[in-house]
Regions:
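Conserved active-site regions of diverse hydrolases
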Residues: 1-315
């Protein structure tokens, strides 16, 4: 079961284990949920949403509370449908699957982004982190209360390395990799508090498995040592247009824009397989695969166990 601001981690997980992609809860026509369900939504936050990028005024209404409510509806309704038998029994998960499932979380990044773009200072955004993490913990506890026992919880990534932050805050102090230093410091503070919360969850619910995954370190290595891992131009958007980082709020990937009285579609760079930043706010498929291949080994997990053990050790 996936809860996230983006569904890349859930998609890559399924692909790596040769499983069908998890069907989105809201895309139920012809969907099979026997392998789980995906509640992730691009742009989603933990707390009640606010615009993340003011120029577009966009945000996802599917913040974590909504994703949780969708999960609860799915849990109840799937069993009602399954009991009808026949083809319905083949499309819905068995009741005990909810206890055996791996609940994956990759969310929080957009809460920080929303703060940065709400005219809050770095310290003011940092001050919101304890409440954000506390709200996250509440939903994990709620899922435990209805049977969840295995949780795979990702840290947030180096938000200060992404083009939408670097473009939005051009005067931000940069580190040796060219990333916005203070924005990344807030991300690391979020991860510190998140790890604390995971440790507390372990104490509160010793019968469950809580795996904390240090996604930040793996993603940051793509910006600090790109050539070592076969990547290039990590700060430059692959699918974008304009400015120092090939990114502009007014020229998003796939949009039609006018340049020198000529219309053009904002398209991909020539070789996305060696690029890190896809559209200024998200990673390329190649970068996501690199991250997943490393974190699935358990080398960046606490406890340091591979993903296949996180899935099964409490069944």
């Amino acid at each position: 079961m996936g809860f996230a601001s983006i569904n890349v981690s859930v998609i890559t997980l399924a692909k790596s284990f040769n499983l069908p992609y998890l069907s989105a809860y809201l895309n139920s026509l012809g969907a099979s949920y026997t392998n789980g369900a995906n509640f992730a939504s691009a742009g989603a936050t933990i707390r009640f949403p606010s615009p993340i990028i003011p120029a577009s005024g966009g945000y996802s209404p599917f913040y974590l509370d909504v994703q949780y409510q969708q999960f609860m509806q799915f849990k109840d309704r799937s069993q009602i449908i399954r009991k009808q038998g026949g083809k319905f029994a083949k499309l819905m998960p068995k009741e005990d699957y909810f206890r055996k499932a791996l609940y994956t979380f990759d969310i929080g990044h957009n809460d920080l982004g929303a703060g940065f773009f709400s005219n809050m200072s770095i310290e003011e955004v940092k001050a919101t982190v304890p409440d954000i993490v506390n709200r996250f913990s509440i939903y994990v506890k709620n899922i435990y209360e209805v049977g969840g026992r295995s949780f795979w919880i990702h840290s947030t990534g180096p938000i200060g390395c992404l083009a939408y932050i670097l473009t939005g805050f051009p005067s931000a102090e940069k580190d040796s990799a060219g990333c916005a230093k203070q924005h990344n410091e807030v991300a690391r503070y979020f991860n510190y508090k998140l790890k604390e919360a995971v440790f507390q969850l372990r104490k509160d619910f010793p019968s469950a498995a809580f795996t904390y995954v240090d996604v930040y370190s793996v993603k940051y290595s793509l910006f600090s040592e790109p050539k070592k891992y076969g990547f290039e131009l990590p700060l430059i958007t692959c699918c974008g247009y304009g400015g120092k980082y090939n990114y502009s709020d007014a020229a998003g990937c796939g949009e039609t824009i006018t340049v020198n009285n000529t219309k053009m579609v904002v398209g991909s760079c020539d070789n996305p397989s060696v690029r890190v930043d896809w559209d200024g706010a998200h990673y390329t498929e190649a970068a996501n695969k690199f991250v997943f291949d490393r974190i699935s080994t358990g080398a960046f997990s606490d406890p340091p166990i591979p993903l296949n053990m996180a899935c099964h050790r409490n069944v």
